[in-house]
Amino acid sequence: MLSFIIKRILWAIPTLFGVSIIVFMMVHLVPGDPALVILGEKANQAAIDALREQFGLNKPLIEQYFFFINNVLHGNFGTSIMTGEPVMHEFWQRFPATVELALIALFMALVLGISVGVLAAIKRYSVFDYSSMTFALAGISMPVFWLGLMLIYIFSVQLEWLPVFGRLSDVYYLDGPTGLYLIDSLIARDYGAFVDTIKHLILPSIVLATVSTAVIARMTRASMAEVSKEDYVRTAKAKGCSSFRVIFVHTLRNALIPVTTIAGLMLAGLLGGSMITETVFSWPGIGKWIVNALNQRDFPIIQSMSLIIAMMYIGANLLVDILYAFIDPRIRLS
């Protein structure tokens, strides 16, 4: 197991190196000068040159790249051009908001998606099967921004049941150790803030979970249908095992292997920040932060976050491979 993990980490190094080159070139090929974005079109040339000198934007691209890589290897991801704050300082300020939203959304997607997929597989070719898979297809096809705007219009504007944006109402203040408001509000015993946090989480988490739920439901159904044809499932039925044991012990456990793969990648994507959802709901996470950085040509943030998100995907893949061994003992990581 340890040798497998070490090999995967070593293989990740050239992957990250390739990602860094591609992202660096793409960022610098995009039209626009960060100095002009910050100072405005009417800024004098001396001020523009001074700002470009401050952030090293006047140096050759190859020199800028190796300067960036050298800093990353020393744990320095640079300084934001717009705010002057260290990139990692701003990242850790926003990451808890994204983590909280991502975990809630993934939990909802796994519970609903697997449940619907299992029921659809059990009641194959029934009305429930056709209707649930139709809704799943609609969920995959539905534009995220449209769904977010519709939920805001119905539940926030018309019914006034839920807040429109943000993580917490202005009447509450939390400064806990985790940055996760659900946990920090319980630590502080501020139950009003806890309820308010849940209200703020409902709409964005539903939007974020919709596509994931649909994908997991369809994959669970397909995997269950395939596994149910295996010899060991037929043997379990022939031995007189109960339907519950056949479904949840022999069929579902093996059907979860492809679901685990997609769930791991979903988690990495959600932790990387859902840009559209966070922007629609003004959620103060890293997704909205990256969108702002793209609009403002903030190269250090874009480059650093691309590397960090790539690390998340590599870590998620490694975690999924390790989980395989627990789900199916026949799999040998070595």
What residue ranges belong to the model's regions?
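Transmembrane helix irregularities
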Residues: 30, 139-142, 271
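Hydrophobic alpha-helical transmembrane segments of membrane transport/permease proteins
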Residues: 15-66, 155-193
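Short loop segments and helix-boundary regions at transmembrane helix junctions
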Residues: 119-142, 147, 157-158
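An internal, D/E-rich "acidic patch" concept
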Residues: 58-114
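Alpha-helical transmembrane segments of integral membrane proteins
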Residues: 2-3, 13, 95-128, 144, ...
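N-terminal signal-anchor/signal peptide hydrophobic helix marking the start
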Residues: 6-16
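Hydrophobic alpha-helical segments of integral membrane proteins
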Residues: 9, 51, 61-77, 87, ...
